[in-house]
């Protein structure tokens, strides 16, 4: 974004509000919730603008219920509202949404706004298995809001020895977004994705040695859509060093559309 040889800017943000959790009598049921506002400020040249601007907006506004005790084999957690959410390690649904911090919004590089515009989340855990259902509306720039929503379920397994595996299905039941193609415009609404993830944080029994991979296949209920995405990541966590640093390398690939075919092949991430 620099004009000339260099550019300078300053940005800051602060989030403030109330959050709490309470137990219902002597039961194994807890109620929780949060309401916060976020004030952000920028001055100088960032990627989009060079003026001075400030913004205060609602960030979190959610409530939920947790059922279960720490010594139980099972637990459940249900919540709804504006809140931060991430699926697995964020390959497909990340807690950091670029669209919620771009354009006119201050503090672009700090990326302070992380709440989804709306969520309905449910988790049921039994021993090492967890089933998570979700319906989310990502936060987007107001005047570019595509009204896209996503609904799905993720079944995951985590072993005491560090092995992790998950199987995911989700779709977009509502969206105003369309993608251009040689055969016309392709709607996001109706897009479906199947995803599998496998990895370990203690590969070959070596604690801290990590290897993870994930593969996603995307189709559509109404049009010819065949897109793929995957990543592989290897790393090591130095647990005995201060701050437990992690050194890793990740390779990721997302398919693009081939205009010479009638099939739409661009992965929608």
Placement of each model-derived feature along the sequence:
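Surface-exposed loop and membrane-interface regions of Gram-negative outer-membrane beta-barrel proteins
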Residues: 2-14, 20-78, 91-100, 104, ...
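Flexible internal linker/loop segments at domain or repeat junctions
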Residues: 265-269
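Signature for the C-terminal beta-barrel architecture of outer-membrane proteins
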Residues: 24, 72-78, 101-263
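Short, glycine/serine-rich, charged loops/turns that create anion-binding
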Residues: 84
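Glycine-rich, aromatic-flanked loop segments that form ligand/cofactor-binding clefts
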Residues: 81
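Hydrophobic alpha-helical segments and helix pairs
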Residues: 87-88
